[in-house]
Amino acid sequence: MNEDTESGYMSARASKIFQSKLELLKRESNWAGMVKMLKRYAKRYPNEYYVHQQLAATLYVDSIAQFHLAFQYAEHAMNIEPDDDLNIYTYACALYYIGQLEKSFEFFTKIINKDIQEIAYGEHGEGLRYAKQLINDSVYMAGVVCQRLHRYNEAKDYFVRYLENKKPFQYSDFTKRQATSHLSELTNV
């Protein structure tokens, strides 16, 4: 067993190989293959929170829908690195999928209320575009949670805010169509 495996962390070389494999599987939308690979890496590198976070996010993809297992990996990633905003977002999503709506809402609002500069350029930051996307996706999910909790006016406010903040060509896990669909459902309530 090599040194990086014993420490629970990847070497720089192993990390590059991992990222390359991960990106290829994402491009192909090969979710089952991604789960298989990520489980191998999670076992081999238990201290690499990013592996656990990616596995959690993949497990709650519709075609996989292993929500309780996703929660376990998201929780593990949070235990390793509770200050990473992507971990917080993934954990909040996992909480949502297992029905812990109030707690999920707390974590989404934690991201929403965080300073955008800190998200963009802090220890785990990946730039302003990433920070805007993460905050706006959290706004969308806060709307979804409020809708499920029957807090309809609050849900409307979040969906309107999401649409106002959504810029052309800005990446998001969600579409304008999804947000407007939620809004139209809420106008009938």
Predicted features along the sequence, with ranges:
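Conserved structural position within tetratricopeptide repeats
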Residues: 9, 40-43, 75-79, 110-113, ...
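"A position-specific structural signal for the A-helix of alpha-solenoid helical repeats
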Residues: 20, 54, 90, 134, ...
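Structural signature of tandem alpha-helical TPR/SEL1-like repeats
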Residues: 28-36, 64-76, 98-107, 151-157
